[in-house]
């Protein structure tokens, strides 16, 4: 916090004047009842019927017709084949289900196997998914960034890429994307376990009977980035949430403690006294106390080495030669190729990052001989 109307959640941040912000303040919860209530409960309406969840995580209304259709699709004609089990679900089970939903096409079955002490077979499924990687086309033109590929001619495989900070920022920005936004970008076809089915289930459930509102439905289907998570080199269009403004309070006592809380319609009414402000949050990617978005995650200018499996390290002549030695690739087998990365390539990189261990090779399609020439 400083006297120029800005605050930061991080230590040693500099304000506009260049000085380190060193006044501590305690963050308080908002007092607006509406904003507090919005975070309570779930996405589904209270009193709604039970739901039917299939093994591949399709969520459907718990109607008899849906149940019979599911059994028919599974070729189960005799009800005597069915067995009922009750399962307790705690934090450990939720984590297992989350992991299974990302990697397995039958996560509920896999979860039961794990509960019974079976071995984890999901790695094989992940490899099979990578083999069926499909390309995703962009919907509009976008800016481009250059990337130099170093290719093994004999293996027709990308060994590594040489990039500037723009491409490194692009890759790191993938880590900030909400899962729902990733599925939206990929058109609900991520090939990632069963999450595509979950995404489709939310689309199919109506706000008349099941989901609480269109706003909450949109929150699941099109979640926004957290404030300041977007970067200047982000080729993919994911909307960023706006950063709230804050009010500053003093307890009016000799020790003079300071408090801040998000600015809402009721924030000026507080037992702490009259609020001062507004204050704006500093963009953590800014070195000069800016409160606007943008910026990048890595320092520039710099060069980075990106492996086929998307391991990003600082580039140096020694590191690249050492890496070729580890791969046992002779220098005479290495060719160079400069490619352009736009929205379409960024979409395919995002998809490959989720399901492939050879992302660069898969995206830039080295079976196309024009890339190797």
Predicted stretch roles:
Residues 1-373:
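Long, position-biased, composition-driven segments near the start of the mature protein
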């Amino acid at each position: 916090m400083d006297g120029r109307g800005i605050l930061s959640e991080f230590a040693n941040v500099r304000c506009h004047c260049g000085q380190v912000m060193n006044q501590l303040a305690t963050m308080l919860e908002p007092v607006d009842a509406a904003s507090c209530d919005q975070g309570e409960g779930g996405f589904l309406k209270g009193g709604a019927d039970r739901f039917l969840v299939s093994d591949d995580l399709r969520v459907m209304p718990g109607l008899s017709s849906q149940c019979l259709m599911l059994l028919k699709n599974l070729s189960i004609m005799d009800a005597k084949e069915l067995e009922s089990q009750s399962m307790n679900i705690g934090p450990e089970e939720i984590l297992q289900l989350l992991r299974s939903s990302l990697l397995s096409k039958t996560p509920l079955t896999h979860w039961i196997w794990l509960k019974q002490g079976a071995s984890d077979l999901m790695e094989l499924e992940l490899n099979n998914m990578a083999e069926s990687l499909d390309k995703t086309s962009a919907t509009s033109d976008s800016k481009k960034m250059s990337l130099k590929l170093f290719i093994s001619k004999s293996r027709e495989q990308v060994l590594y890429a040489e990039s500037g900070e723009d491409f490194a920022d692009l890759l790191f920005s993938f880590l900030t994307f909400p899962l729902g936004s990733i599925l939206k970008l990929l058109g609900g076809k991520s090939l990632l376990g069963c999450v595509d089915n979950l995404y489709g289930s939310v689309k199919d459930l109506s706000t008349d009977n099941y989901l609480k509102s269109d706003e909450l439905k949109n929150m699941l289907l099109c979640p926004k980035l957290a404030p300041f998570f977007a970067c200047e080199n982000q080729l993919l269009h994911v909307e960023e949430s706006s950063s709230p403004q804050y009010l500053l309070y003093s307890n009016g006592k000799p020790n003079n403690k300071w408090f801040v809380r998000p600015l809402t319609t009721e924030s000026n009414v507080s037992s702490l006294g009259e609020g001062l402000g507004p204050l704006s949050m500093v963009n953590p990617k800014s070195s000069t106390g800016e409160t606007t978005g943008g910026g990048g995650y890595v320092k520039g200018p710099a060069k980075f080495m990106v492996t086929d499996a998307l391991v990003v390290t600082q580039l140096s002549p020694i590191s690249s030669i050492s890496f070729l030695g580890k791969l046992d690739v002779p220098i005479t087998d290495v060719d160079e190729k400069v490619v352009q990365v736009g929205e379409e390539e960024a979409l395919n990189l995002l998809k490959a990052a989720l399901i492939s261990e050879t992302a660069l090779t898969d995206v830039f399609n080295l079976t196309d001989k024009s890339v190797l020439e």
